[in-house]
Amino acid sequence: MKDIVDFIGNTPLIKLKYPSEITGCNIYGKAEFMNPAGSIKDRTALGIILDAEEKNLIEPGGTVVEGTFGNTGIALTMINNARGYKTIIVMPDGASEEKQSILRNMGAELKVVATKPYSDPGNYQHVSKRLVEELQSKGETSVMWANQFDLSLIHISEPTRPR
């Protein structure tokens, strides 16, 4: 039986009729909204988790921490639930109530912080990284920072799923 993670990727290409007609060439859109968590961030989150598993950065029952406005956190939570990991999301208070509600309903632990610029130590990304360091200093051995904005390996490695 397939797992929900198996349905990430393989999203259809949809021909965009009007732009194709006015340009004289075929123009297609990739329907990433058809991924299980509803966005292209499903691929990103899966790539992060597969990379972490391959490098033994996370163990069964471990914790994944990420700072996000929503879509990556939703995708990470879905994947982590399927793989048996706990998810802690640090989210700025400017994120939508809907995304906060979705994350809570999916089982993520949500920490909402004041919206701060990246240069501020209180920025949600910095807070998420510090949270990982705090958990590790308290003896948690299998906790990782997803760090979605450092995808240096994912974009040059094999795609997470066929395109």
Describe the function of each predicted region:
Residues 72-134:
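Active-site-proximal loop->helix
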Residues 42-50, 64-85:
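Conserved beta-loop-alpha segment that forms the PLP phosphate-binding cup at the N-terminus of a helix
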Residues 37-38, 117-121, 152-155:
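Short, small-residue-enriched loops and turns at beta-alpha junctions
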Residues 1-62:
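Positively charged, low-complexity intrinsically disordered leader regions
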Residues 144-153:
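Short glycine/proline- and acidic residue-enriched helix-loop micro-motifs
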